[in-house]
Amino acid sequence: MAGSQLKELKATLKAHGLTGQTNVKKSKKGKREAKKYDHEEKARTIAKIRDRFNPFEVKTTKNKRKGGDPGLLNSDRVAVGKPGISKQIGEEARRRAFEAKKLMKKRKGGVIDKRFGERDKTLTEEEKMLERFTRERQAGSQRKKNLFNLEDDDEDGPIELDMFGNKLTHLGESLSLADDLNVQAEDTEDLEEGQPQRKKTKLEVMKEIIAKSKFHKQERQAAQRKLEDNIDELDEDFDDVMAELMTTQTLKQDDIEVPAEEKDYDIKVKELNLEKRAAPADRTKTEEELQKEAEERRQKLEEQRLNRMQGMLEDEEGEERGVEDLDDGFWGSDSEVEEGENIANSDEDIEVESSSEEAISYKSKKLVAISCPQTHPEFLNDLKGLSLLEQPIHVKAIIKAYQPKLAEGNKVKLANFSKVLLKHMIYLANQRYDKDLIKFDKTQNEFLIILKRLSEKYNQAISEVSREYILDIQERFKKQNFHALNNGDILFFIIVGVLFSTSDQYHLVVTPAQIILCEFLEQIRFKSLKRIAVGSVLLRIILQYQRLSKRYIPETVYFLQKALLSLVVNPDDIESDMTLPIRLDTFDCGLKLKEPSLPDDAVVHLHELFTKSTTNEEDLKINVLSNLFEDLEKLIGSHWNNEAAFPEICEIFEPILSVYKVRYPSITTVESIEEKIKRMKKLNKHYPLALQAHRPTAIPSYAPKFEENFNPAKKSYDTDVARNEVNKMKAQLKKERKFVMKELRKDTKFEARQRIDEKKKEAEAYHSKMSNIINTINTEEGAEKNKYEREKRLRAGKK
């Protein structure tokens, strides 16, 4: 039979040297032995012994490492936790959370609206407002009634009144404690007569202070009311008093004699006041300094243009920004507009020479007033009676009369007028001006100069109207294709190239305009000579846009190839074996002359493109062909020469040039273009495309890997990393959800136990209270019963 737990505990403690005989005599000469256990080791040993004798309070697991204390039972197991203590800690935490939640119950959740009728759905808004107003006035009148009541000594509370306003009494005596207090006060006053004056209490002092403050406040309000009455009386008599003052004769200034010295002094003081304050004058700069500043300014502007061409912008702080960072600052700030104030009133730009015949005829006409038209119909109405050459003079007069510094709002008017001027130039281009071609050119050039000056100041307004017009052109082109274009559209694209910076990588007006020009070159079917002529004009405009940036435009290559082939191919070539690289829209535009000669100054006039002109068709072909060869030579010499694909681009035109050379040897431009291509190819460094050079990497070789404890149920061997991570996250989420649900169940059970305990305590308190009441009643009834019995016995004994 095993021994008791106490004997085992004593034996274990003695075996570890924790108990036993401690009064063993030691030799004095011998050295003191070191303690067998230090404090930490002793504490660990005691903890192990305690855990051994309380096996159900410690959660253990098998020790993977061999070795243990042979003196202890189950020393090969390791403690991993104490469920009892953990449970106790969790219970304490839940109890604290429950108490905090119970304290905050009914203490949060917003504001309770106690206004009258707020929760009554039967009342309208007017009824609620009326009732609230009535109650507020009643409360205010009650406060004002007792505000200055100096005889009101009832500080303790209101007097009890019945429904008729009478004081409540019982058997003729008042229920208020004030009467009893007054009686007691009278008795104390009688007793205190003849005694020295006592010190006032704090309550009496405060009552006196309140009474005095009420009295003084009433006095101040009375004085204020009296002052306001006097002011009102003076206001009523103000007109009469001023009338009396105006009738009095004042002494004239001329009648007063002022000495000459004082007059001179006053004049001198006024001159000094009107004179500008002295300021240090700028030093006169030499011609070298002025040239240097101008050169620095030009270099700075060129640097800014190059940055915009590369797609980089700089803000005021010098930080570079990309095209995507454009904001409202792109238009220019108000300060920049104010700096350009002198553009509108520049004499050299707006004033007309007196010797001009148009200016003299314009001044001779009687104009009542110059208005600043805000729409194009208004402007056309103002131009009635004016010749074509007088219109620019009228425009200059409008700009001079509506300078921004002359009146407020002129800046907005001139901004709108700049839009009207652009529309008017397009309107004039769409009119028939064959007979007045020289006057038309002169007028449009003057308008363009004026619009250029206005665009420097009103850039945003002109940009907005330009973008709107580009959208209008695009919509018309979608519906009617080539028939939607007119002279005004061509002139508009020319004006855009003059007004705005065409070298920018992205521009709010130039970029959309160039996109739609390329769309024209690609989508228009060039099935007639006039269409090819229009395309050559559009090509010249695109080259003008790219004169500085020199970007490669694929649509120009496509149009040049198609136009040159259309002008060299004849209907007879259809039956031959001639192969064409692209599909042509017509075969009727080829040159019919055997030895054509290209002029040096070939010009294609706009008025000949969209009207039935009498120009010879062969002359128009020669002019168009001359322009095309000139554009091709310019592209090869200045635009495409820096491209890495220069040989591939020129391969498109080499067979076409060879055909022209064979059929029309009189065209010497072809030979010069071929020589230029050969020379450019020699200078061009063409490197084929290649991948980036990397160091060769060795193919990794892996030895086969074997696992002794292979178990796919415990470890995932999926080669897909993404799916493996997803499964891992799902498992972790499942584990966390399970843990949270477990904690929620524990919290719910704990709260249920706490509520049951509270209900039990309430029930016990209630029952104990009721039992106490019943016991008290029974005790009193029993005492009264005994008393009654005694009295009954006494009465019976007397009988």
UniProtKB/Swiss-Prot annotation:
Alphabetical GO biological process terms: endonucleolytic cleavage in 5'-ETS of tricistronic rRNA transcript (SSU-rRNA, 5.8S rRNA, LSU-rRNA); endonucleolytic cleavage in ITS1 to separate SSU-rRNA from 5.8S rRNA and LSU-rRNA from tricistronic rRNA transcript (SSU-rRNA, 5.8S rRNA, LSU-rRNA); endonucleolytic cleavage to generate mature 5'-end of SSU-rRNA from (SSU-rRNA, 5.8S rRNA, LSU-rRNA); ribosomal small subunit biogenesis
GO molecular function, one term: snoRNA binding
Signal sequence extent: none
InterPro entries, A to Z: Nop14
Ranges of Basic residues composition bias in the record: 25-34
Record's compositionally biased regions (Basic and acidic residues): 782-799
Cellular component, GO annotation: Noc4p-Nop14p complex; nucleolus; small-subunit processome
Source organism superkingdom: Eukaryota
A Pfam family: Nop14
Subcellular location: Nucleus, Nucleolus
The entry's keywords: Nucleus, Ribosome biogenesis, rRNA processing
Segments for region (Disordered): 13-41, 56-78, 133-158, 277-304, 777-799
Cited function: Involved in nucleolar processing of pre-18S ribosomal RNA. Has a role in the nuclear export of 40S pre-ribosomal subunit to the cytoplasm.
The family this protein is said to belong to: Belongs to the NOP14 family.
Subunit organization: Component of the ribosomal small subunit (SSU) processome.
Protein name: Probable nucleolar complex protein 14
